[in-house]
């Protein structure tokens, strides 16, 4: 029995094909021969068209995803325009869209592909990496500032508790009498303060592990440098959730 199941088209490819065919998006169009599409205005595309393809407004992430699906960047006569090509992505060729799938690349094939890329493609990838590294560096600085602030707070608490413990060692039960004597005073006329040293341990245990988070962020920043050759997962590459 023949299966009636229709070929599956990736959401990103289907939506890309839709907006290229939509005349209301003047910033992304087919070429005259209909074999390629080009972006006439990157700024306008990021503001108007990109939100229909992605939850992010990062143009470099959009370009990277095109490469993942096998698109290549063609040389454009206009420096302000970018043109992309895929043998199965063409005008009036919606029946070919199921053939466009994510490429599965090993480290060796990814290395070979990056070696054969044009300078423009490599520049786009480097720009994306630089943007991600800049964001990570900002997060690291923010975490370091929080660590410094937390250290000051902890040092202040330690000094305060040290003074309290010294007083507590000389007089374990500190009484603050209210017009009473030490002996025989009613319980409702005295304030007894007992200090428990175990509270210090609980206080230190409740301190957030910022050092661990800082170390993880540094590891992420280091891994980002190996992005071109070591990453083949779409979500980890872009930190972008395309739908």
From Swiss-Prot:
Q: Where in the cell is it found?
A: Nucleus
Principal location listed in the UniProt entry: nucleus
Q: From the UniProt entry, list the residue stretches annotated as the region Involved in trimerization.
A: 121-164
One term of GO molecular function: DNA-binding transcription factor activity
Keywords assigned by UniProt? Activator, DNA-binding, Nucleus, Stress response, Transcription, Transcription regulation
Q: Which InterPro entries match?
A: HSF_DNA-bd, WH-like_DNA-bd_sf, WH_DNA-bd_sf
Keyword rRNA processing in record: no
Subunit info? Homotrimer. Homotrimerization increases the affinity of HSF1 to DNA.
Function, please?
Answer: DNA-binding transcription factor that specifically binds heat shock promoter elements (HSE) and activates transcription.
Looking up PANTHER family in the UniProt record yields: HEAT SHOCK TRANSCRIPTION FACTOR (PTHR10015), HSF-TYPE DNA-BINDING DOMAIN-CONTAINING PROTEIN (PTHR10015:SF206)
Name of the protein in question: Probable heat shock transcription factor
């Amino acid at each position: 029995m023949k299966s009636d199941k229709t070929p599956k088209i990736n959401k990103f490819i289907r939506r890309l094909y839709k907006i290229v065919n939509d005349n209301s998006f003047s910033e992304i169009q087919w070429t005259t021969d209909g074999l390629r599409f080009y972006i006439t205005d990157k700024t306008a595309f990021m503001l108007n068209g990109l939100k229909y393809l992605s939850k992010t407004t990062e143009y470099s992430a959009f370009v990277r995803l095109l490469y993942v699906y096998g698109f290549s960047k063609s040389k454009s006569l206009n420096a302000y325009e970018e043109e992309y090509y895929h043998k199965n992505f063409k005008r009036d060729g919606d029946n070919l869209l199921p053939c466009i799938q994510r490429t599965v690349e090993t480290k060796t094939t990814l290395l070979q592909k990056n070696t054969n890329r044009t300078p423009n493609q490599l520049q786009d990838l480097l720009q994306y990496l630089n943007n991600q590294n800049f964001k990570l560096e900002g997060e690291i600085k923010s975490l370091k500032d929080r660590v410094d602030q937390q250290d000051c707070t902890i040092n202040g608490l330690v000094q305060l508790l040290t003074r309290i413990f010294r007083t507590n060692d000389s007089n374990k039960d500190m009484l603050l009498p209210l017009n009473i004597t030490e002996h025989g005073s009613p319980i409702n006329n005295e304030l007894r303060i007992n200090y428990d040293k175990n509270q210090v341990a609980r206080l230190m245990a409740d301190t957030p592990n910022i050092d661990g988070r800082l170390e993880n962020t540094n590891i992420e920043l280091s891994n980002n440098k190996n992005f071109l050759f070591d990453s083949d997962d779409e979500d980890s590459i872009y930190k972008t959730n395309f739908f």
